[in-house]
């Protein structure tokens, strides 16, 4: 059973980063940094597939094995892959420090082999008042992505 994972984020533009995942009890700690972003919030999600053959688009929708509507990371109604937003500073750097009780590195909610995506816009956490909000949080385009793999 994997207890650690890593993801290298890359895209067509300047956005890049490294994200690490570590299982701690019944939660997963997500840490790392992303550079090349515009200042402000950016949606941050685990997507269904580990397929990046057509860039980040082929990663599919948010990882949602429970068939729920999109929400924030602290919401009862959320996709497993809904990790909310990362916040970039004026230098375009986002420091990631998330503890999530729903994602896992093993079992039915395992994110191993799936794609981590950082988005162009803020995630409205499903509160945008339209259909797209309940699917994607209106987070916009996919700036960078990478497949989550087992780490030593």
Curated annotation (Swiss-Prot):
InterPro entries: SOD-like_Cu/Zn_dom_sf (IPR036423), SOD_Cu/Zn_/chaperone (IPR024134), SOD_Cu/Zn_BS (IPR018152), SOD_Cu_Zn_dom (IPR001424)
Key words, A-Z: Acetylation, Antioxidant, Copper, Cytoplasm, Disulfide bond, Lipoprotein, Metal-binding, Nucleus, Oxidoreductase, Palmitate, Phosphoprotein, Zinc
PTM note: Palmitoylation helps nuclear targeting and decreases catalytic activity.
Residues bearing a lipid moiety (S-palmitoyl cysteine): 7
GO terms assigned for molecular function: copper ion binding; protein homodimerization activity; protein phosphatase 2B binding; protein-folding chaperone binding; small GTPase binding; superoxide dismutase activity; zinc ion binding
Modification N-acetylalanine occurs at: 2
TM region(s), chain numbering: none
Spans annotated as Disordered: 53-78
Disulphide-bridged cysteine pairs: 56-145
Entry-annotated residues carrying N6-acetyllysine: 121, 135
EC class of the enzyme, as a word: oxidoreductase
UniProt: Zn(2+) binding residues: 62, 70, 79, 82
One GO cellular component term: cytoplasmic vesicle
GO biological process, one term: apoptotic process
Summary of subunit composition and partner proteins: Homodimer; non-disulfide-linked. Heterodimer with SOD1. The heterodimer CCS:SOD1 interacts with SLC31A1; this heterotrimer is Cu(1+)-mediated and its maintenance is regulated through SOD1 activation.
Protein name listed in UniProt: Superoxide dismutase [Cu-Zn]
Taxonomic classification: Eukaryota, Metazoa, Chordata, Craniata, Vertebrata
Name of the gene: SOD1
